[in-house]
Amino acid sequence: MDKSPENKSALLIDVEHVLRSKNPSLAKAVPSFIINYLKRIIHQDDVNSLISDNADLRDAEFIAAVLKTMKISYKVYGRENIPVEGRYFFVSNHPLGGLDGLVFMDELSKHFSNIKFPVNDLLMNIKNFSGIFLPVNKHGGQMKDAVRLLEETYASDSQILYFPAGLCSRKKHGTINDLVWHKSFISKAIQHKRDIVPAYFSGRNSNFFYNLANLRTFLGIKANIEMLFLPHEMFRQKEKNISLVFGKVIPWQTFDHSKSPAEWAEWVKARSYELESLIPG
């Protein structure tokens, strides 16, 4: 079968189809030039080529192939802090919104055969990640199943990779930083007796991305329209080198009643950002 982006029946990521399935009336009202613009900014053809060219690969093999195709290299510091055995939350800042997740999975899949990554439900459409990704925002009748699956995974021997901020970093007052780290990973670490391994990624998106996010916030627009540009930001990173640092294990018993779970989450966030100092230069 022809897997070229031009073959409509072979499309894996299809802006028009998503619009029609999510909001048919809106899809009819949106002019074709807007549809074509959306296709360009999400790099629909590039993404479909990456997926179709590696259609037979899954999980770790697929990730390695994507990184190779995009000529992404990365250096790891503090690799000795990655435990040999046990059950952990590996948590990190989220500066890039795409490639950092791929690098996170690629590195940890070299150490563990059972990694799991809770992600936005939309990413579940990429079947090449089906053995790693877990949906976190299912709605309606599927929500209970998703919650049950998450709890079963937290209770299992799988290693959990997690971006506690949820969204990628934003630029405020001239500084690029994660948004608030959600407290759920602290609560689940305590509940399931999972130690936490903090990590830190180097990297940044374009000024355009940060300025758009700030403008959207200033105008009071709730929809994260800047997220549409994350695929473009990812392809801008081609041939780049990324640094990843792992810190020392934080025992789950650390999270006592001296702080609230939300305060402990911000404490771990601070430990993550302290790791930047371990990157040479």
Show which residues each predicted segment covers.
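Membrane-anchoring hydrophobic helices of lipid-metabolizing enzymes
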Residues: M1-V91, G101-V103, K110-F112, S130
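Short, basic, glycine/proline-bearing loop/turn elements
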Residues: V91, F129-K138, A165-H173
